[in-house]
Swiss-Prot record:
Native organism: Homo sapiens (Human)
GO molecular function, one term: DNA-directed DNA polymerase activity
Binding-site list for Zn(2+): C419, H426, C446, C451
Compositional bias of kind Polar residues: 490-507
Pfam entry (one): Herpes_UL52
GO cellular component, one term: mitochondrial matrix
Keywords assigned: Chromosome, Coiled coil, Disease variant, DNA damage, DNA repair, DNA-directed DNA polymerase, DNA-directed RNA polymerase, Manganese, Metal-binding, Mitochondrion, Nucleotidyltransferase, Nucleus, Phosphoprotein, Transcription, Transferase, Zinc
Residue window of motif RPA1-binding motif 2: 548-556
Keyword Repeat: no
Coiled-coil segments: 1-22
Protein name: DNA-directed primase/polymerase protein
């Protein structure tokens, strides 16, 4: 008995000694003294769509992050939490330092860049100078095309360069200005970088940047100082925060040497000697994963840090650390709605439609002025149309903007100007309808200067149940279930007979047995299993290499 007790006591002493040397990580708990701290929400998902559905059904202000699991396999799991709780663990836990912000589709966002080139393939390239010239060029484009004033002091400059690769992230911190979404950011950059893209298509080797011991030959003069005018290259200047170029004139003017800026410094070579742009134009896609400040790619040691030549400094606060301020500034989709916020748009060059699109009826027909389509929630669009189609007035949706952090849809209304503040219609100023999907309410605001000065906001009115997110998700799930039941029913009646949709494709009998549907289900199930295994083996399991306490043990201790 004594021996057992002594052995037990020894185990306890060893465990106590271990935790004295390596104490358990503290747990995030919002404090009453800081009411701005959100409640704890920490959910992991194997699929990105599941994570976004949870965010949309959650009342709290939560966001989606992607976490790399294993080296080389590209698998990621998705974390949903608040910025505050994420930063609480992120700043101290090594197994979280391979994270990405998921930039939500259709969400208002900041202007951002991913810059890189191979150092051995470009021995004369001066990366710092290239970044400075690019920032100056983009600032001039923003000023001429949109009337937005900015400088290098408004650009957060992050670096993760190695001996092999120069790598930077730039995130513009524009004052009361953001882009409609990252697709519009990509359109804007493709237009202003067209002269550099033209160089890539040139067969003349002389057009490629020559490298010398002092850098590229064109570094002596910034392109923004060469007398170049964007208004000449792009035939229409910004009107009401949007602009569209005439493609024929663009080609004609783009071919004129005197009207094109010298962007040869943006053309670099890869390790195969092929030309490509210093600016990665592939990062402006739906639900893009963009690496976080202080994160490295899994298997790599170099994280994104603030550069020595960074000129942006966040506003200091007594309650918030500088590091947390930099983190919040680095988030591309961290944009809040305000009455003074301007939304910039840019349509692709091949789009011949001009102007802002608005819906002219509750039906499906769309009258296009600028080429915008439905919001992410068409049911909400139709509800808003019902609000502005009454009393003999046929109002429309001039445009919409989606603010992901608040799950807020902001509709600019046209042809309907009735304002609750003055009890009548404005003579010349339009109104806005704002739909708060988290709180399931809608309200009206104004573009009228007097209403803006009063910070007018109408009473909140409840949304109809059929346009609330929980109802929409339930309806979607029921539709998916019914579709699956119908498929199983058809297979039960005659498992060897192809459905009409399959017959319409002209598939043979052999093709029916190997039509790819079972394979799709099999691949999906396999992917789920692999993701679950990856999550279990990497993020959720004990990592002996970094010698951290596993999440399960923390939860077990808290429960005890």
């Amino acid at each position: 008995m004594n021996r057992k007790w002594e052995a037990k006591l020894k185990q306890i002493e060893e465990r106590a000694s271990h935790y004295e040397r390596k104490p358990l990580s503290s747990v995030y708990r919002p404090r009453l003294s800081k009411p701005e701290e959100p409640p704890s929400i920490w959910r992991l998902f194997h699929r990105q769509a599941q994570a976004f559905n949870f965010v949309k059904s959650c009342k709290e202000d939560v966001h989606v992050f992607a976490l790399e699991c294993k080296v080389g396999d590209g698998q990621r799991i998705y974390l949903v939490t608040t910025y505050a709780e994420f930063w609480f663990y992120y700043k101290s836990r090594k197994n979280l330092l391979h994270c990405y912000e998921v930039i939500p589709e259709n969400a208002v966002c900041k202007l951002y860049f991913d810059l890189e080139f191979n150092k051995p393939a470009n021995p004369g390239a001066d990366g710092k100078k290239m970044v400075a010239l690019l920032i100056e060029y983009v600032c001039k484009a923003l000023q001429e095309l949109y009337g937005v004033n900015c400088s290098a002091e408004d650009v957060l400059n992050l670096d993760s360069s190695t001996d092999e690769k120069f790598s930077r992230h730039l995130i513009f911190q524009l004052h009361d200005v953001a882009f409609k979404d990252n697709i519009h950011v990509g359109n804007f950059l493709r237009k202003i970088l067209q002269p550099a893209l033209d160089l890539l298509g040139s067969e003349d080797d002389d057009s490629a940047p020559e490298t010398t011991g002092h850098g590229f030959p064109h570094f002596s003069e910034a392109p923004a100082r060469q007398g170049f005018s964007f208004n000449k290259m792009f035939t229409e200047k910004a009107t009401e925060e949007s602009w569209t170029s005439n493609s024929k004139k663009l080609e004609r003017l783009g071919s004129a040497e005197q009207s094109s800026p010298d962007l040869s410094f943006l053309v670099v070579k890869n390790n195969m000697g092929e030309k490509h742009l210093f600016v990665d134009l592939g990062v402006y896609t739906r639900n893009r994963n963009f690496r976080l400040y202080k994160s490295s790619k899994i298997g790599k040691r170099v994280a994104l840090e603030v550069t020595e030549d960074n000129k942006f400094f966040p506003i200091q606060s007594k309650d918030v650390s500088d590091e947390y301020q930099y983190f919040l500034s680095s988030l591309v989709s961290n944009v809040r709605f305000s009455d003074t916020l301007r939304i910039l748009t840019c349509e692709p060059s091949q789009n011949k439609q001009k102007g802002v699109g608005y819906f002219n009826s509750i039906g499906t027909s769309v009258e296009t002025i600028e080429g915008f389509q439905c919001s992410p929630y068409p049911e909400v669009d139709h509800f808003v149309l019902s609000l502005v189609n009454k009393d003999g007035i046929k109002g429309g949706i001039r445009r919409w903007n989606y603010f992901f952090p608040e799950e807020l849809l902001v509709y600019d209304i046209c042809k309907y100007r009735w304002c609750e503040n003055i009890g009548r219609a404005h003579k010349s100023n339009n109104i806005m309808i704002l739909v708060d999907l988290k709180n399931e309410v809608w309200y009206q605001k104004c573009h009228d200067p007097v209403c803006k000065a009063e910070n007018f906001k109408s009473d909140c009115f409840p949304l109809p149940a059929e346009v609330c997110l929980l109802f929409l998700f339930k309806e979607e799930e029921e539709f998916t279930t019914d579709e699956a039941d119908e498929t199983r029913s058809n297979e039960t009646q005659n498992p060897h007979k192809p459905s009409p949709s399959r017959l319409s494709t002209g598939a043979s009998a052999d093709a029916v047995w190997d039509n790819g549907i079972d394979d799709a289900y099999f691949l999906e199930a396999t992917e789920d299993a692999e993701l679950a295994e990856a999550a279990e083996n990497s993020l959720l399991s004990y990592n002996s290499e970094v010698d951290e306490i596993p999440d399960e043990l923390i939860i077990e201790v808290l429960q005890e």
